[in-house]
């Protein structure tokens, strides 16, 4: 049987008619999503009249026998509409070359749909992962036509695609609706009405859980999350009450490191180390009773993208609320994670780390020479100032990359999506402002990358600041103010990316 084509139908809502396409091969939810984009009535509020009753989310649209030109009646209150832009939205394909060049290095925001800053900030940081964009672009499932997480991943792909077409703010209507359908906690209402504020870390983990089904671009049998966002933790548990009991060894995956914050925590790495050594109580087969154990964790695999959660919220029984820890905790823009790994991994990454540092130092020195020679003809600069021409610099970098690759152990080279050096650079931050977890305001900060085709561009010194639909550019040193110490915006989720040449 040939593939069904979409049918042009009409939807009537509040006396207005809308032209919409209906895909007979999709589910009812897909049609509701299309209605939502036209009428701004969220799918969960819609009552779509069909013969015999109301359209359900899981109804096969092919079974309702829709006809081209048929009119569907829709009942439901529209959500609050985003304010109209002060100037017409200009899409990238309509821009002249010069404007397009500037716009390609700019990113638009996301419209706050009512206490959704937690989601907007999370989505902006997730978007900074280029391998994720590539994997989503190759994903073929459709919203509504697939079940569960597959539909959420498809909605994420469509949202990022729409964001890539314009520099204006985009309302994440469909993705938010899908998230609330799959995870009802994000549909909770506040005491005063409307949707409640949620935890950005919980939103991050739920989205990553859905992305576990996303194929990687390296192979149809591989998955994006295990390759790029999952590490391996080696765990040793030792009974402290019996020297006769042998320690237990095991390994398990992790998707995020926890930075616990105590009265003595001053920096991120010390907080992570504290979380990796725990005291616990469990049954001892040797002693035949409950006994105390010490659990030590070390990282056996470092992923290319490593999120760190600053555990700033804890439950206070006396007031029955989550309370925020305001303590100042510094975090690095560049980070060597080798102090957290197993001895075996430390031995493998040590020569790679040393070689990368050596090459980056030499490149930095050459960049200084190039800067001094700026504005002079290439030939003159090369002779008089010692600066390489662009072509010479590119050739030198190719040589350096080959030398670097030669230092990587075969086991690391074959592990697509791992960090081979242990060196990371900060690329994204979700911050929280306020004293309570269920209140306050989330924002995100994403490193502004140089143009992809400018291989000789110096490292970025600017960051995007995303405050929902408001986007600005700030210098990198502004990040130092996000360490905490007050009720202003403080780092809550950090995303580190493996350094590359």
Residue ranges and their predicted role:
Residues 2-501:
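UBL (ubiquitin/ubiquitin-like) substrate-recognition surfaces
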